[in-house]
A protein has these predicted regions:
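N-terminal, intrinsically disordered charge-dense segments
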Residues: 12-18
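HDAC/HDAC-like amidohydrolase catalytic core signature
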Residues: 37-216
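Positively charged N-terminal leader segments that act as targeting/secretion signals
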Residues: 18-30
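N-terminal leader/targeting segments
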Residues: 4, 18, 38-41
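Generic detector of N-terminal low-structure segments
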Residues: 32-35
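Intrinsic low-complexity, disordered N-terminal segments enriched in polar/charged/small residues
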Residues: 3-9
Length: 216
């Protein structure tokens, strides 16, 4: 099948096999129920590598809100209700991401952690200076602090050693789910972390790096 099976022994006791509408369901409601119980979920445990320690909120350095447990909670709930098979994503090239986003932005993302640690830093990489009106916008900085600000709109986009791998796997999850639907599945759920809906053509922000839904 498409993708790699993450959970071979999924409890299927909740799945519905009868075509009859059971008591308490309208035909339309039961159809939705059946579709959801046939739906594949695409998920990658590689998101666990993206585990920022802190973020800047309301003038204070606080524990990061966007953390692995957010996705893990949903993953565990999918299993608990027997929503359907959970599969891993296939690997996808970044060609489409570079059509949605500026290629130089996508090329920058895998380099952030190495650039950060090359300066002797060990904590979460966060931007703290941003280009403002009146400064030249046609020249990209070549130092990591300037580059982080150049490619972001807030300080909610921390990087640690596993962040890029999580970004890439989230991108792959979305594309794999999209292909399942294109191949005839009625529905597929892309359980993406980090999320992507705030990311723009040339910038990250709001915990988002690649706009997964736009790419898919």
């Amino acid at each position: 099948g498409n993708g790699r099976n993450v959970h071979e022994n999924v409890d299927r006791s909740h799945e519905v096999t009868s075509t009859d509408t059971p008591p308490g369901y309208s035909p339309g409601g039961f159809l939705f129920f059946r579709i959801m119980h046939l739906m594949k979920t695409v998920f990658s445990p590689r998101h666990l590598g993206h585990s920022n320690q802190v973020e800047l909120v309301a003038g204070a350095i606080v524990p990061a809100f966007e953390k692995p447990s957010r996705a893990q909670f949903i993953h565990d709930r999918v299993l608990a209700v027997g929503l359907g098979e959970i599969i891993g994503p296939d690997e996808w090239p970044l060609d489409t991401a570079k059509k949605v986003h500026r290629p130089d932005y996508i090329d920058f993302l895998p380099t952030v952690w190495d650039r950060w640690t090359a300066e002797g830093r060990t904590g979460t990489a966060l931007p703290f200076t941003w280009p403002t009106r009146g400064l030249r916008g046609d020249k990209r900085p070549d130092f990591i602090d300037g580059m982080l600000g150049y490619y972001s709109f807030d300080a909610g986009i921390g990087f640690v050693s596993g962040t890029w791998d999580a970004i890439k796997s989230s991108h792959d999850v979305a594309l794999t789910a999209g292909r399942l639907v294109n191949d005839g599945q009625k529905a597929a759920y892309a359980l993406c972390r980090p999320p992507g809906h705030h990311a723009g053509a040339g910038f990250m922000g709001g915990y988002c790096y690649i706009n997964n839904i736009a790419v898919a």
